Amino acid sequence: MSGLPVKKAGLIVAVEMFAVFEGWGQPDEIYEGRYFKLCRYDRYDMQIFVARSGPGQKNAEDAARMLIDDIGVAELWNFGVAGGLTEAAHVGDVFVIDEVIRWDGVCGSGVFEADGAERGRRCGCGARPEAFRVDAPAGAADVRQGVLASGDSVVSARGARLMLADITGADIVDMEGAGIAAAAASGSYPCFMVKCVSDGIDTDEAMLTADFRRTARRAFDAFDMMLKKSQV
């Protein structure tokens, strides 16, 4: 890297860290952060700090705020798997998120612990134009813009997923996106999320187990392609 200031970016990963290791190899540095262990990669003329948060909104929000406050990252990223909420969200489809909807309360309160927002809050998530100038990863039906519903409860039943889609207008659901979006919104930090559908509305448990690693890696590959494109 040159003597110029190096851009720092933060990547929050819930449980898909294996895909980072498979795609980028071993990190340039590993050390203990305030809440979570951090891996640093020097790639694309940047320092990329990766925090494995584990599942859940509060963990993801804590990881994002640690990256902002302790590392001084300029933007936040996330890739990972998500559940499909409609018939149109197929296993293997890749979504670049342009809006995150907080859909459930923490501990039944109806208020999101990370920022005190009521359920139903909508956060913009900055889908980048270059995301739509890349080829879909092998086998993916589509790479498209989408809306992410995000909450601390697991939504698995077909009826519950269809109802959530109807209420929120979301395409997919996860358990971390709202925490990351809340941290980004608190300081107007750019936020970029890429999700791959690991389970559709009719996916059974056996299929989910079989598809998880494949779709997590597909999410990473799509994210990495878009990241390369954005640095050109």
Describe these PLM feature segments:
Residues 84-168:
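Mid-sequence, gly/pro-rich, charge-dense loop/helix-turn segments that line enzyme active sites
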Residues 48-54, 145-149, 194:
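Active-site-proximal beta-strand elements of phosphoester/diester hydrolases
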Residues 10, 74-77:
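Structural motif
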Residues 153-202, 210:
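A C-terminal functional module that forms or caps the active site or interfaces directly
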Residues 1-65:
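N-terminal short beta-loop-beta anion/metal-coordinating cradle
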Residues 4, 67-74, 187-189:
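Glycine-rich phosphate-binding loop signature in dinucleotide/nucleotide-binding domains
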Residues 191, 196-232:
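Regulatory input/activation interfaces that engage signals or partners
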